[in-house]
């Protein structure tokens, strides 16, 4: 995305340009590059990048499970493809405890899918609790020279395990954290443990005045329900 303007039409006297996120990327691969864009008047995050954790609801045989999209605003698309690498995720701790390769995918309904793997389902898997994350469909992200203003939520929400660069941007009075790094498996089910993020040369003006984790301008906030100091996520 180069020089894209997400904002009310000039002269329209409107304050809002979107009722939710403006640029929302879910389950992508490759590289997402957003350069010299302008965001104003979003009612949710101007930029949101993440994967999706699907809950394991049934074990069909030693290699096959039934998975379910859990959030009512995120379902009905192809989340897995033959040959993809996946991780089994403990929902309470957000830890990846096993991996496998997808052998076949069968869509059952808009909310459920049957997936077969190249190895046995982990014995420690907890049905109706743990999730499966697609590791293959995770993008690199580069956001540069952008301007974020007049949003009641975050400026940039980032959840991907691949390299992320957020540089030379201006965040002006975002209501919550200007940059939020977060993942969960029991709420929005937005997946992707973050491993490599560079945030540099950005300008933050009056951000996080109305909320966000501890009103932090840059917030790292994994939503794991169980916290273990010996095994941080």
Regions flagged by a language model, labelled:
Residues 1-233:
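Extracellular parallel beta-helix/beta-solenoid repeat domains
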């Amino acid at each position: 995305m180069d020089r894209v303007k997400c904002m009310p039409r000039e002269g329209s006297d409107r304050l809002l340009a979107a009722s939710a996120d403006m640029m929302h990327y879910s389950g992508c691969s490759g590289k997402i590059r957003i350069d010299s864009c302008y965001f104003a008047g979003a009612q949710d995050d101007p930029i949101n990048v993440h994967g999706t954790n699907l809950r394991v609801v049934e074990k069909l045989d030693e290699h096959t499970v039934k998975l379910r999209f859990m959030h009512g605003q995120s379902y009905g698309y192809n989340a897995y493809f033959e040959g993809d690498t996946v991780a089994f995720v403990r929902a309470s701790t957000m830890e990846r405890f096993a991996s496998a390769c997808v052998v076949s995918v069968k869509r059952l309904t808009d909310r459920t899918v049957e997936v077969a793997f190249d190895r046995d389902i982990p014995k420690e898997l907890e049905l109706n609790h743990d999730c499966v994350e697609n590791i293959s469909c995770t993008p690199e992200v580069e956001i540069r020279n952008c301007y974020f203003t007049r949003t009641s939520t975050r400026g940039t929400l980032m959840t991907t395990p691949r390299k992320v660069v957020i540089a030379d941007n201006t965040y002006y009075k975002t209501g919550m954290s200007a940059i939020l790094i977060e993942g969960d498996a029991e709420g929005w089910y937005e997946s992707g443990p973050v491993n490599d993020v560079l945030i540099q040369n950005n300008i933050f003006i009056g951000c996080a005045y109305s909320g966000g984790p501890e009103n932090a301008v840059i917030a790292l906030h994994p939503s794991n329900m169980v916290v273990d100091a010996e095994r941080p996520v």
